Design a protein with these regions (language model features):
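Phosphate/adenylate-binding glycine loop and adjacent helical scaffold
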Residues: 79-105, 114
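Short strand-coil-strand connectors
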Residues: 51-53, 77, 99-101, 178-182, ...
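Long, compositionally biased interface segments
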Residues: 28, 220-272
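Surface-exposed beta-loop interaction hotspot
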Residues: 103-171, 178
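Forkhead-associated
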Residues: 42-91, 223
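Hydrophobic, proline/glycine-rich low-complexity stretches
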Residues: 2-47, 68-72
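Acidic/His-leaning functional-site neighborhoods
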Residues: 176-223, 233
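Broad, structure-driven detector of short, well-ordered beta-strand segments within folded domains
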Residues: 54-62, 103-109, 184-188
Length: 272
């Protein structure tokens, strides 16, 4: 492997990783984080009621609509709504949160379909959570690579944790790197911040010590010469590793690495 810096102080490296991992688990276990999700519902044109949300829900050309019964109310963008309320057309990978008592009702769109995802802080998956197991951090797994942009972003269709659902991402390029004497590559998608990247992958540990379907790695923006650092110590589980109520994307076929990435997060202890 080509590591970022062989002189990295292991104490500092470990402390920074531990702080990062605590933040990641804290967000996951937030009172309305993904561990609080109690259902994944797909509204249709025919109105229907869901057991963990108020009102009767439907969707159509104007977006998702809820009809709240007597005594039922939601708070949307700080405003109390009663009776009939239409949330409007939600963009792909967008969402709106409506507050219902101490719960939040997420209204979102994934793979071209509207969904309803209630989040209740008392959900057993959240209250029983003890933290995500992971490999011990090791600077050897902070691998230097090269980002090679495509002439134009390539629309890339991938599967999802929900059977029959598909996601489409623009892939701006690929990352080439070496591990165990082998040159490997990963198709990259855009990250959460401008210029940053994200890769979805599986490897030889998938289904053995790490979650079978996918892991994600967020990568800082490439340097002027295309240099990037893939710190596999920060390879994370997606929500689908913890719950069936997630629509997580699967890696593109070319991102199935033939080596064991013995770094990052492992299969969770808790799952519902």
């Amino acid at each position: 492997m080509t590591v970022q810096d062989s002189s990295t102080d292991i104490g500092t490296f470990t402390a920074e990783w531990e702080a990062w991992h605590r933040r990641k688990d804290s967000a996951l276990a937030h009172e309305h984080g993904f561990l609080a999700v109690t259902g994944l519902h797909w509204p249709a044109t025919d109105p229907q009621r869901f057991p963990d949300a108020p009102g009767i829900w439907s969707t159509g050309d104007d977006g998702v609509t809820v009809v709240l019964g007597e005594g039922e109310e939601l708070v949307v963008d700080g405003t109390v709504v009663r009776g009939r309320h239409t949330f409007g057309v939600i963009p792909e990978r967008g969402g709106v949160n409506a507050v219902w008592g101490d719960a939040v009702i997420e209204i979102a769109k994934r793979g071209g379909h509207d969904l309803i995802r209630p989040r209740h802080p008392e959900h057993p998956l959240r209250t029983a959570f003890t933290g995500t197991p992971a490999y011990a951090p090791d600077p050897r797994w902070a691998v230097t690579g090269t980002y090679i942009p495509f002439p134009e972003p390539r629309p890339t269709t991938v599967g999802a944790a929900v059977e029959g659902l598909q996601h489409v991402y623009d892939a701006p390029g690929r990352i080439r790197f070496r591990i165990e004497g082998r040159t490997l590559g990963l198709t990259a998608f855009n990250g959460h911040t401008p210029g940053s990247l994200m890769v979805l992958f599986t490897d030889a540990t998938s289904g053995v010590t790490t979650y079978p379907a996918n892991r994600a790695l967020h990568i800082d923006a490439p340097g002027p010469d295309g240099t990037v650092v893939l710190d596999f110590n920060r390879a994370t589980n997606l929500p689908c590793a913890y719950t069936d109520f997630a629509t997580c994307p699967l890696p593109p076929a070319e991102n199935r690495l033939p080596v064991a990435i013995e770094a990052g997060e492992k299969i969770p202890h808790e799952r519902i």
